[in-house]
Amino acid sequence: MMGKSSLLDEAYELCEEGKYTLALEYYDLVLFKDPKNITAMINKGVTLQTLGKHSKAIKCYDDALAIEKNNLDALVNKGSALHTLGKYHDAIDCYEKALKIQPKYAMALAYKGLALGEIGLLKDAIKCFNAALKIDKKFDLALDNKTIALELLKNNTKLKPKLLKKG
């Protein structure tokens, strides 16, 4: 029988091959043998998220956070799942918790920027993208979304005078 670390490795490989349902069975087996295995919890959550099962993924991240409340991967992945469910404020809370622990976490900054953009706070979103780009100049997610946010901001300011004239 394989050891728990090789089961984790197998599950990861299955995910790489797109065999997510089978990977979930492996993660469950790891967690049956080692109920506090945070890596298995988080990877199971990521796999569930990939399958579109965001609420179940959030439960996995919450389980990991119950054991290790400052786990950056669990916080950012939970934020990502909440974002996908349209719970932008809750997602922002997760990213802010991660940033309190690791202020120069480019991914958390970029994801926070995405969530801020979703609720219309484009200037704040751009600040987050800029901060992420200061840490990682080639971070495509931050660069691409900064460009989109700037364009939206520009178009939004062009529309305002026209709307005021009609009123």
Q: For each predicted feature, which ranges?
A:
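Alpha-helical segment of the N-proximal tetratricopeptide repeat
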Residues: 3-33, 39, 46-50
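Helix-start (N-cap) detector for alpha-helical repeat units in TPR-like alpha-solenoids
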Residues: 3-5, 38-39, 72-73, 106-107, ...
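Position-specific recognition of the canonical hydrophobic site in helix A of tetratricopeptide repeat
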Residues: 15, 42, 49, 76, ...
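Conserved structural position within tetratricopeptide repeats
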Residues: 29-32, 62-66, 96-100, 133-134
